[in-house]
């Protein structure tokens, strides 16, 4: 069963000293975002959900290094199918927990939920992202990586 939270995972890699971020283009909405998905009742923690979603959506190895970000957004529940049946009429927002993941793979496999992905600089990624919550998490991750505070 779908749990009452969302996860956002921002894949990143180093090319020399440059940091690049992978963005995915959603098949259903045509917008750019990080890896996003919901917690399931079998996930023990939001980090476990993040690892599962990253594996499902981009085939990122679960042993990859994850950074737990301080950024937490509130997502209106109406964005989720059957939200009232899942969580009741009194649930108006759910939290979105954010993570970065260091990707070693050169080529990532996309799930059917996305049409393409691209590696971007921070500035390019910031311009492409659709959602403010993604931009805030990207900013935090970029600052942590630039300042080596992970």
Enumerate the language-model features and the residues they cover.
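Short, well-ordered beta-strand micro-motif
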Residues: 11-13, 25, 98-102
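Short coil/turn motifs at secondary-structure junctions
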Residues: 14, 29, 104-106
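Conserved Nudix-box catalytic region and its N-terminal flanking loop in Nudix hydrolases
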Residues: 18-63
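Generic C-terminal helix-cap and adjacent flexible tail
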Residues: 143-150
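Active-site segment of metal-dependent pyrophosphate-handling enzymes
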Residues: 59-106
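Short aromatic/basic micro-patch
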Residues: 33, 93, 119
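NUDIX/MutT-family hydrolases
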Residues: 96-139
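Conserved N-terminal beta-strand and adjoining loop/helix that marks the start
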Residues: 1-21, 42
